[in-house]
Amino acid sequence: MSTDPVFSDIQKPNPSAIIELFTLTLDNALHGATTVYRFHAGTNLDTNGKIVWAGNEYLRFPVQATGFAYQRGQLPRPTLTVSNMGSPSISAILLTVNQTTAGNDLTGAKVVRIRTMARFLDAANFSGATNPFGTPDPTAEFPQEIYYIDRKKSENREVVSWELAAVFDLAGIRSPKRQCTRSLFPSIGTFGQ
């Protein structure tokens, strides 16, 4: 991953569009599979189909992701809302996952938000296999934002909504996991003396 190209492109007078991609990775212990779902909202690039980024296909899927902004004094807890009308429907995926861990509702699944610029997308996305915005670069992206599904907020016929959290902001996770004592770390308490 290289952030230099995207930060230099974003500062240009006429930067290309920011493309937002998502991966949802299931945990075998919690969900009974390690399936990776890749999708995009389809709102950043004028396309009704998939987007190919770094050799991976991201399917167009109605999704709304909000709340990624960092605020003073607290970590973001974004909300991911996904259409329940697709094929397969999110409810069907939840039923499969809940057979392994009842009532799990994808809790603990890893969600990665990937953002790049249109000029760095694979040439396969464009007619003639040529990117009209620039040279494809599968390593040029903003820093990835990694979250885990903390809880399902709502589910109905139309949408399913989850609250995401950073790994150390999940329920039941304490930091530090290892207690620092003088017997394990002899230099504790010696600073400033």
Segment roles from a protein language model:
Residues N156-C180:
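Short solvent-exposed strand/turn elements
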Residues F120-E141:
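Active-site-adjacent substructure of cysteine-protease-like catalytic cores
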Residues R151-S154:
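Residue-level recognition of beta-strand microenvironments
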Residues A54, P136-Y148:
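Short coil-to-beta-strand transition motifs
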Residues P5-D9, R157, K177-Q193:
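Ubiquitin-like/PB1-type beta-grasp interaction modules and other compact soluble beta-rich domains
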Residues T66-D122:
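Extracellular/virion structural assembly segments
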Residues M1-R60:
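Polar/acidic, low-complexity leader/linker segments enriched in S/T/G and N/D
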